[in-house]
């Protein structure tokens, strides 16, 4: 997966994109990540997490 490309397209930091993708691959949902994993996402909103997911 090209985390750098996703980060560029979404305008988000690559570090957080990588962590969101890892959480998604582990089976976490967008609402769960945006509510309960703010420390891993740098405080991304549910819309931003969904952008990474798509």
What spans do the regions from the language model cover?
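Long, charged, helix-rich clamp/arm modules that form nucleic acid-engaging surfaces
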Residues: 1-54
């Amino acid at each position: 997966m090209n985390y750098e490309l996703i980060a560029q397209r979404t305008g988000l930091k690559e570090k957080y994109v990588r962590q969101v993708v890892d959480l998604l691959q582990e089976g976490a949902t967008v609402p769960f990540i945006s509510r309960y994993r703010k420390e891993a996402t740098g405080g991304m909103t549910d819309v931003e997490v969904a952008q990474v997911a798509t």
